[in-house]
Amino acid sequence: MADPARARRLAVRIREVVASTLERGVKDPRLGMVTVTDVRLTPDLVDATVFYTVYGDETARQASAQALESARGLLRSQVGRATGVKVTPTLTFVHDRLPDDAQHLEKLISVARERDAYLAEVRRDARPAGDDDPYRRPRPAAGEVDELSEVDELSEVDEYGGTARQEG
């Protein structure tokens, strides 16, 4: 197992070498606008996974994947020359889904913001359904005294929030 700091430095160096070789050394017409986003190494530094993105649609992505697979030997030899390690890591190319996922999340967030704005607009002009007081109270029968109205007539709220009896 290699030192984690050494593995990070080697991963950065592999990313730089692969990116510059793709830019200058690979002449495959299938290779589109490829960006190397990340390289991850196994703890024993034998296998390297190269993450990349491609500008364009699905056909450009597939064509670039085929071009990267055919250029894997050239890229590995360039990595071996540039890094000088005892065992040159085997390169595996994986399309990086992070930008696609981020774009999808941005769309979802914008849709949620639009819905929130619409609901805020509806809420601003909304009024409660029915009466202002949503609780139903039984109506007193003719001749009966409503207990609540009797208490209201007999008591008064003082300045401290308590009730005081009215003298009459």
Swiss-Prot record:
GO CC annotations on file? cytosol
- MF term (GO), any: ribosomal small subunit binding
User: Where in the cell?
Assistant: Cytoplasm
Q: Which Gene3D superfamilies match?
A: 3.30.300.20
Q: Where is the composition biased (Basic and acidic residues)?
A: 122-136
Instruction: Write down the superkingdom of origin.
Output: Bacteria
> Which of UniProt's keywords are assigned here?
Cytoplasm, Ribosome biogenesis
Tell me yes or no: is Lipid metabolism among this UniProt entry's keywords.
no
> Which stretches of sequence are listed as region Disordered?
122-168
Q: Which family does it belong to?
A: Belongs to the RbfA family.
Name by which UniProt lists this protein: Ribosome-binding factor A
Identify the species of origin.
Frankia casuarinae (strain DSM 45818 / CECT 9043 / HFP020203 / CcI3)
